[in-house]
From Swiss-Prot:
Transmembrane segments: 40-68
Subunit structure of this chain's protein: Component of the ubiquinol-cytochrome c oxidoreductase (cytochrome b-c1 complex, complex III, CIII), a multisubunit enzyme composed of 11 subunits. The complex is composed of 3 respiratory subunits cytochrome b, cytochrome c1 and Rieske protein UQCRFS1, 2 core protein subunits UQCRC1/QCR1 and UQCRC2/QCR2, and 6 low-molecular weight protein subunits UQCRH/QCR6, UQCRB/QCR7, UQCRQ/QCR8, UQCR10/QCR9, UQCR11/QCR10 and subunit 9, the cleavage product of Rieske protein UQCRFS1.
Record's bilayer topology term: Single-pass membrane protein
Subcellular location: Mitochondrion inner membrane
InterPro entries: Cyt_bc1_su8, Cyt_bc1_su8_sf
Function, in words: Component of the ubiquinol-cytochrome c oxidoreductase, a multisubunit transmembrane complex that is part of the mitochondrial electron transport chain which drives oxidative phosphorylation.
Family of the protein in this entry: Belongs to the UQCRQ/QCR8 family.
Topological region Mitochondrial intermembrane: 69-82
Post-translational modification Phosphoserine, affected residues: S16
Name recorded for this polypeptide: Cytochrome b-c1 complex subunit 8
Gene3D superfamilies, sorted: Cytochrome b-c1 complex subunit 8 (1.20.5.210)
Chain ranges on the Mitochondrial matrix side, renumbered to this chain: 1-39
């Protein structure tokens, strides 16, 4: 054993690179590249996703209205009862 945690085994042919936490920036290019990229991705995927949501919303509203209508009694069925 004798090795410290993190260096428990020696791995051959594996190269890893790392930066010191003091050399890294927390959020590089968030405002210059990140937000425009989010807007671009939204525009690209909007017309693929939006029609499905519209169809789902129309079917859902139709289904709830039809359900509420079917719960009511039909007054024409009780006109001749006395």
């Amino acid at each position: 054993m004798g090795r410290e945690f993190g260096n428990l085994t020696r791995m051959r042919h594996v190269i890893s690179y790392s930066l010191s936490p003091f050399e890294q920036r927390a959020h590089p290019h968030v405002f210059t590249k990140g937000i425009p990229n989010v807007l671009r991705r939204f525009r690209e995927s909007f017309f693929r996703v939006a029609p499905q949501f519209v169809v789902f919303y129309l079917i859902y509203t139709w289904g709830t209205e039809e359900f509420e209508r079917s719960k009511r009694k039909n007054p024409a069925a009780y006109e001749n009862d006395k």
